[in-house]
Amino acid sequence: VQSAAGLGEVWVVAPAAQCSAMSHRITVRGDLEVKPYDFPATGVTAYSVGGTPADCVKVALGCLMTEKPDIVFSGINAGYNVGRDILYSGTIGAAMEALCWGVPAIAFSVAEEDECEVLNTYLEPVAKELISKTLPQNEIWNVNFPGCTLEEYKGILWDRIPDQNQY
C-alpha cells in the first residue's frame, strides 16, 4: 500500500479472511458484509468484504467507488502465481474481475510472506513501468517477486505465463 500511495489515490477493498485458491469465484447467493476498515496508512480508503477477492473488486467498482479507478492492484499473494497455478489464484481472479469491468489490473505475488526484500525494493518501480505501458485490452499483468535477497536478485524476466519450473 505504501508503494501505491506514491502513484495516486489508494483504495483497499480486501477479503475479511484468507482466500487462497478461490480462483474467480464470486458470491451469487446471500449478502456480502462490507465494513469500513481503519487502515494504518494516511489517506487510504479501506473496506473489508466477507467474500472472495473477485467479490472485493465487484463491490469496489460496482458499489463503493463513484468513478472507475485507473488501475486495480491485486495481491500481494503469498506464493508464486505461475503456470497452472494461475487457474486457482484468487489474486489472479480479482485482476480478471477488474478486466471484466474494463479496468486494467496487475496481480502481485511473492515467493513467501517473509521474503519481501526484492518486493519492497522493486514493487513501486515495476508498477510505474507497467502503468506506463499500454496493456492489450483482454490481458492483465501478473508479477511474481522472487524470494531472495537483493544480492541474489538477477533482474526482471518479462514473459507470458511462465512455466512453474522456471522458478
Task: Locate the predicted segments by residue.
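Short, Asp-centered acidic motifs that coordinate Mg2+ and/or phosphate
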Residues: 71
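A cross-family phosphate/adenosyl-ligand binding-site feature
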Residues: 3-56, 60-63, 67-68
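Charged helix-capping and loop-helix junction motifs
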Residues: 87-93, 122-123
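Electrostatically charged, flexible surface regions
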Residues: 120-167
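Short glycine-rich anion-binding loops that position phosphate/pyrophosphate groups of nucleotides
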Residues: 18, 52-53, 77-80, 148
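Glycine-rich phosphate/pyrophosphate-binding loops
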Residues: 99-119
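Short beta-strand segments
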Residues: 13-15, 74-77, 108-109, 143-146
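Alpha-helix C-terminal capping segments
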Residues: 60-66, 93-104
